[in-house]
């Protein structure tokens, strides 16, 4: 596309992202089961699952894009489970009314991450992306209300450097470790998001963070923290 893209990764490889721990699958309104599924039905299921607290426009857009995401993942080589006839398999997952979950056994997140990483590696090989591993973003360069670069630390040498940019995209994932109990990796914290917020980035609904049922104690001193 003509862009000079630099990717900065806190870990020693993008494959260390916590997405590798996801298991269940992805919901998409492809209606392979011919059971009346549609974008609107996926939208309504998602809204109900969120107790109607989610922003409707965003959820509807998510439902619209769901089928394309599956196609993209397949093109990246993600080995979704298939029926004997070769069609992608579906199962019911997460309280939905129809079978619309696409999955890779119990390792969907790992396979999606491998597919995305393979595409990234291809772009790196083509010279379209330059990868910087073991680099922690310390601050953002802001000029005239727009982000124009980053300040980062090389975690191997300890050297602090800066990089100018026309645009900065944060892809830090969740930050479930702001809660007392979490099954997420310790790197899933609010550090990068807080640094962007401190520099003026807009932030909304910080309470919408997934808490895995594994971390809900039956009783004890910390139960009130999860209500």
Language-model segments: what does each one mean?
Residues 1-42, 82, 105-227:
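Residues forming the flavin
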Residues 11-12, 64, 74, 87, ...:
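Residue-level detector of functional hotspots within protein domains
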Residues 15, 51, 55-62, 101, ...:
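Short secondary-structure transition/capping motifs
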Residues 23-24, 50-53, 92-101, 172-174:
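Gly-rich Lys/Arg/Thr-decorated short loops/hinges at beta-loop-alpha junctions or inter-strand turns
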Residues 46-93:
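Rossmann-like flavin
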Residues 58, 71-77, 99-104, 146-149, ...:
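Short, charged low-complexity intrinsically disordered segments located at boundaries
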Residues 81-113:
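Terminal amphipathic helices with adjacent charged low-complexity linkers/tails
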């Amino acid at each position: 596309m003509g862009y000079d893209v630099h990717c900065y990764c806190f870990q020693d490889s993008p494959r260390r992202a916590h997405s590798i721990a996801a298991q269940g699958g992805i919901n998409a309104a492809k209606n392979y089961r011919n059971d009346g599924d549609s974008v609107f039905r996926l939208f309504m299921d998602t809204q109900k699952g969120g107790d109607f607290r989610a922003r409707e426009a965003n959820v509807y857009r998510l439902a619209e894009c769901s089928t394309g995401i599956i196609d993209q993942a397949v093109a990246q080589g993600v080995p979704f489970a298939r029926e004997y006839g070769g069609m992608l398999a579906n199962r019911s997952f997460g309280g939905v009314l129809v079978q619309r979950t696409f999955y890779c056994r119990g390792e969907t997140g790992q396979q999606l991450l491998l597919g995305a990483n393979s595409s990234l590696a291809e772009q790196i090989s083509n010279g379209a992306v330059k990868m910087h591993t073991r680099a922690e973003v310390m601050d953002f360069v802001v000029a005239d209300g727009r982000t124009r670069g980053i300040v980062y630390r090389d975690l191997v040498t300890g050297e602090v450097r800066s990089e100018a940019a026309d645009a900065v995209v944060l892809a830090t994932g969740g930050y479930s470790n702001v809660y007392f109990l979490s099954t997420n990796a310790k790197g899933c914290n609010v550090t990068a998001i807080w640094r962007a917020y401190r520099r003026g980035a807009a932030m909304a609904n910080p309470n919408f963070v997934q808490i895995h049922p594994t971390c809900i104690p039956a009783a004890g001193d910390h139960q009130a923290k999860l209500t």
